[in-house]
């Protein structure tokens, strides 16, 4: 069991449609508490199954079960290594698009009725902003994994890129 404190909390203000897990970072390790009771188990199982795919080790994060004590409560959850180094930060696609075009990516995508055109728009828009030429391959892998594991909570607030202080992306 690990005990975590308020200064370690990293929970975002924006909640997903499934609620919001408490998240902390402490000494190079990320911790996520279950919100509905199964998120940690799902992340553990899926991350360990990904070891047997053709994904490289730097393309996913392994999760391990963890009991987390925060304030007076004990949570079931998971831990993983920190995947953000130095001055890199996570920026969601929604925030990235809003910063550049001053409009909601989600709203723009919902106005495109054809699924293929919607995916093409998403890939081209993010490639244009970030210069990430392999973005299409990445997003197709992500959606394939989501479909295989029945992830029903994918949206533009939980797909992200990494950006550093110089404006480089990965």
Regions found by a protein language model. Name each.
Residues 87-91, 112-116, 120, 133:
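Low-complexity, intrinsically disordered regions enriched in charged/polar residues
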Residues 117-170:
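Conserved kinase catalytic-core segment
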Residues 34, 58, 85-87, 114, ...:
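Acidic-enriched, low-complexity/disordered segments with a strong bias for Aspartate over Glutamate
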Residues 48, 111, 155-157:
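Histidine (H) residue identity feature
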Residues 42, 76, 115-118, 135:
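Alpha-helical structural motif
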Residues 99-127:
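Active-site-proximal helix-loop-helix substrate-binding element of RNase H-like nuclease domains
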Residues 1-106:
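Conserved ATP-binding subdomain of kinase catalytic cores across diverse folds
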């Amino acid at each position: 069991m690990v005990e975590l404190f308020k200064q370690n909390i990293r929970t975002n203000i924006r909640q997903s449609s499934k609620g919001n897990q408490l998240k902390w970072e402490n000494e190079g390790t990320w911790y996520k508490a279950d919100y509905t009771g199964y998120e940690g188990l799902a992340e553990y199982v899926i991350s360990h199954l990904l070891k047997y795919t053709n994904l490289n080790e730097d393309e996913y994060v392994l999760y391990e079960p963890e009991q987390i004590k925060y304030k007076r409560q004990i949570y079931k959850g998971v831990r993983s290594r920190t995947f953000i180094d130095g001055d890199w930060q996570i920026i969601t696609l929604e925030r990235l698009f809003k910063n550049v075009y001053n409009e909601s990516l989600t709203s723009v995508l919902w106005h495109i009725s054809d699924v293929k055109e919607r995916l093409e728009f998403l890939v081209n828009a993010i490639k244009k902003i970030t210069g990430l030429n392999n973005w299409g391959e990445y997003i197709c892998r992500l959606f394939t994994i989501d479909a295989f594991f029945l992830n029903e909570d994918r949206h533009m607030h939980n797909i992200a890129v990494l950006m550093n202080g110089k404006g480089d992306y990965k």
